[in-house]
């Protein structure tokens, strides 16, 4: 299994750090939004379906969160510094696909190569979310997944 969110980068791969908002759990590969909390800028998973965010939580590398296990499986907790990066055209990334049990229509977590994907209201991607921004580069079926069991899917931004 791959161990990095970004599959194809343009440029240096510079990143930004923001503390994770209170009450949030952030998985590498989730879409993020910036909020103001306690007088500082923090991040949380995208909270509106169809949002236009291109800020992505990447796996923590500086320093790594753990010397064992896949960095994509090591989530950020409230207050942790989240390494994030803008996702630009012509790049490819491994982002989180919604679990079927979390969606009103579980089949929106069944993705074929070439399908258009948009943000769901929990920072994951799904079909039919309005305002699709990404194109699936592989087929993944996460329709039978339990709540919170987010798959990883390789995508690129739509042109």
Give the ranges of each region predicted by the language model.
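Surface-exposed, low-hydrophobicity beta-strand/loop segments enriched in small/polar/acidic residues
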Residues: 1-159
């Amino acid at each position: 299994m791959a161990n990095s969110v970004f599959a194809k980068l343009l440029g240096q791969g510079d990143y930004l750090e923001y503390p994770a908002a209170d009450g949030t759990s952030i998985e590498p590969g989730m879409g993020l939004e910036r909020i103001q909390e306690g007088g500082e800028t923090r991040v949380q998973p995208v909270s509106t379906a169809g949002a236009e965010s291109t800020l992505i939580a990447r796996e923590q590398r500086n320093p790594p969160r753990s010397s064992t296990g896949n960095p994509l499986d090591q989530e950020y907790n409230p207050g942790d510094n989240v390494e994030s990066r803008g996702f630009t055209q012509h790049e490819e990334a491994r982002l989180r696909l919604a679990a079927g049990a979390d969606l009103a229509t579980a089949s929106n977590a069944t993705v074929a190569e070439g399908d258009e994907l948009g943000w769901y209201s929990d920072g994951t991607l799904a079909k039919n979310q309005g305002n699709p921004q990404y194109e699936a580069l592989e087929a993944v079926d996460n329709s039978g997944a339990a709540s919170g069991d987010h798959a990883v899917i390789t995508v690129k931004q739509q042109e």
